[in-house]
From Swiss-Prot:
Pfam families per the UniProt record, alphabetical: ATP-synt_A (PF00119)
UniProt source species: Limosilactobacillus fermentum (strain NBRC 3956 / LMG 18251)
Keywords assigned by UniProt, alphabetized: ATP synthesis, Cell membrane, CF(0), Hydrogen ion transport, Ion transport, Membrane, Transmembrane, Transmembrane helix, Transport
Gene giving rise to this polypeptide: atpB
Biological function: Key component of the proton channel; it plays a direct role in the translocation of protons across the membrane.
Transmembrane residue ranges: 17-37, 76-96, 113-133, 170-190, 196-216
Gene Ontology molecular function, alphabetical: proton-transporting ATP synthase activity, rotational mechanism
Protein name (record): ATP synthase subunit a
Family: Belongs to the ATPase A chain family.
Compartment(s) where it occurs, according to its Swiss-Prot or TrEMBL record: Cell membrane
GO cellular component, one term: proton-transporting ATP synthase complex
Length: 236
């Protein structure tokens, strides 16, 4: 378990098999989970429909809390899917970690900075498109010079720092959690029964804590995404 990422080259470009496989697993789990929860919808929800409606209300609450009412509905579905995808991505490495010949094959996609920075780039780019669509090109760029022109370089630094912190925060938490689980698993088999007795309870406790951390990081990511979009839409 663990090791270097499994990569291959195509047309001079290097592709990461680990991220492709792990991401595909997350997509499949997300699709079938939402498909299963949304089957047999009724006016009086029961079972899986209750869970689905709770998640929808939860993410809708995030959007409504950050965005003006006239635009919140447009981004509700995006935030819902993003939250579910991130939550499952954060938990995948706690359920499945598989390696072969010194290479990682399956892990949490969000334990790789390339994945999290790409998601952060998509979120920040969407916020800029939303700002242009709402305010127009002139109004969008005018915000960078408010309340006075000297704010322009400061706001550029702020934009870059928002991008970095959004992607690195979730990566750091998920990567650190999985790394500690690997260390505890290695310690369990290092000196036989004594270390196994000590490390196994610690690993169970840390896995439970990592589930909580993964949920919090998914919540933080989607909340900050809605904040960034709201700022561009409202011009604040």
């Amino acid at each position: 378990m663990g090791g270097d990422a499994f990569t291959f080259e195509l047309f001079g470009l290097t592709f990461n098999w680990t991220n492709l496989i792990s991401g595909t697993i997350v997509f499949v789990i997300t699709f079938f989970l939402l498909f299963g929860l949304s089957r047999h919808l009724q006016m009086k929800p029961t079972g899986g429909q209750n869970v689905l409606e709770w998640i929808v209300e939860f993410t809708n609450g995030i959007v409504r809390g950050q965005m003006p009412s006239e635009t919140s509905g447009f981004y509700s579905f995006f935030v819902f899917v993003l939250f579910v995808f991130l939550f499952i991505s954060n938990q995948l490495g706690l359920i499945i970690q598989f390696g072969w010949n010194g290479h990682e094959i399956v892990k949490s996609p969000t334990a790789d900075p390339v994945v999290t920075m790409t998601l952060a780039l998509c979120a920040v780019t969407l916020s800029h498109f939303a700002g242009v669509a709402r305010q127009g090109v002139k109004g969008y760029f005018a915000d960078y010079f408010k309340p006075f022109s000297l704010m322009f370089p400061i706001k550029l630094v702020e934009e870059f720092s928002n991008f970095l912190t959004l992607g690195l925060r979730i990566f750091g938490n998920i990567y650190a959690g999985e790394l500690l689980l690997k260390l505890l698993a290695g310690m369990a088999f290092s000196h036989g029964i004594p270390t196994m007795i000590v490390s196994l309870p610690l690993e169970i406790i840390w896995q439970g804590f990592s589930v909580f951390i993964g949920a919090i990081q998914a919540y933080v990511f989607v909340t900050l995404t809605t904040v960034y979009i709201s700022r561009k839409v409202t011009g604040e």
